[in-house]
Amino acid sequence: MTDTPGLLGTPLAWTPPARPAGPQMERAGNGSQGPGPLFLTSPLARGVSGVFVWAALVLTGHQIYLHLRSYTVPHEQRYIIRLLFIVPVYAFDSWLSLLLLGGHQHYIYFDSVRDCYEAFVIYSFLSLCFQYLGGESAIMAEIRGKPVRTSCFHGTCCLRGMTYSIGFLRFCKQATLQFCIVKPIMALVTIVLQAFGKYHDGDFNVRSGYLYITLVYNASVSLALYALFLFYSATRELLQPFEPVLKFLTIKAVIFLSFWQGLLLAILERCGVIPEVQVIDGSTVGAGTVAAGYQNFIICIEMLFASIALRYAFTCQVYSEKTESSPAPSAPMQSISSGLKETMSPQDIVQDAIHNFSPAYQKYTQQATQEAPRPGQGSVPSPRTPTHSPDGGPGGGRKGRNVEKRMLIPAEEL
């Protein structure tokens, strides 16, 4: 490189022409985009999450089919199938939310369905434990009058000097049922507020509905899980033959992981770890939407491991053995479909809510539910229930009617 004399005799140094500053300035000015596109919208994230989701769906779908094919103890397997459905609901819902991540916040509608089913799962697990033990009266025959074991770990440190009564079982049922009522209401309120622009994920402003819905939801789910834990600690020895530890830990892990993940992501958002603004497909989204996207991605991955754990926790072996020992043929597809329809019916939840919140509850308590064997499923009684009342009706293809027994409870025991 040589110097060329200037107009006044001073040397001028040659410099290469500068690159256009437009793209660099645009890239630097748009710091919200970062060094590259958002990972959640990349084909890698969507492909990996899709593989995990479909693997979980296949594993859980096969297990649900096995239970429906060996539907020999309906009053137990009804709740087991409901619990197993948590994987398809969580996995597919989270994957759709991830695929539709953007400025329109379509994921809120899918997440509302997922959260409502969470309440359904908590109630179903408690009801399954009740069925294992023979119903409320059978449980009271074992624990009535026994002192409550006080423990900070079990959350009973403030119950010193108290004994178990029918009121304890009623509290456990009411605490789980209230979540089944509160959660759908909060989901509906969320959808309405989002439609009017008054709800944004991660917005803790007092003028936003997110703060109040989060407070109500956390209080409701905490009460439901606390009641579930209280019931388990009170009946742990009675439930021992049914191997409840893996069942209990698996269900609580699925629910608690989603809860604490959401809380952790909200904290990271408040700390500024998640950028305030992101651009997805030309639409500007806030940090709350991005945090919800990361949670949905994590849930997609976790559901495969949850499906494996549930496969061991709620095995179909004991029910399939009943089918093999029965001389009746295997259940046809019509019986499988009717069993699935019965499983998804919320009628028992409505009846249970009316029963437990009724002022007349103090006059009676629910006895174990007895059901008739289904056609084509044999009449082998469950070892967990003393008897089965056959359906005396002529409808051979109709499901057996529920026969509920009631037992009077003295008012002073409430």
From Swiss-Prot:
Signal sequence, renumbered to the chain: none
Gene: TMEM184A
Chain ranges passing through the membrane: 48-68, 83-103, 120-140, 177-197, 211-231, 248-268, 290-310
UniProt family annotation: Belongs to the TMEM184 family.
Full protein name: Transmembrane protein 184A
Region of interest called Disordered, as start-end residue ranges on this chain: 1-32, 323-342, 364-414
Record organism: Bos taurus (Bovine)
Main location per the UniProt record: membrane
Origin: domain of life: Eukaryota
Expression tissues: Expressed in vascular cells (at protein level).
Subcellular location as annotated: Cell membrane; Cytoplasm, Perinuclear region; Cytoplasmic vesicle membrane; Early endosome membrane
Molecular function in Gene Ontology: heparin binding; transmembrane transporter activity
Residue runs in coiled coils: none
Key words, A-Z: Cell membrane, Cytoplasm, Cytoplasmic vesicle, Endosome, Membrane, Transmembrane, Transmembrane helix
Membrane-protein topology: Multi-pass membrane protein
Biased composition (Polar residues): 379-388
GO cellular component terms given for this protein: cytoplasmic vesicle membrane; early endosome membrane; endosome; perinuclear region of cytoplasm; plasma membrane; secretory granule membrane; transport vesicle membrane
Reported function: Acts as a heparin receptor in vascular cells. May be involved in vesicle transport in exocrine cells and Sertoli cells.
InterPro entries: Ostalpha/TMEM184C
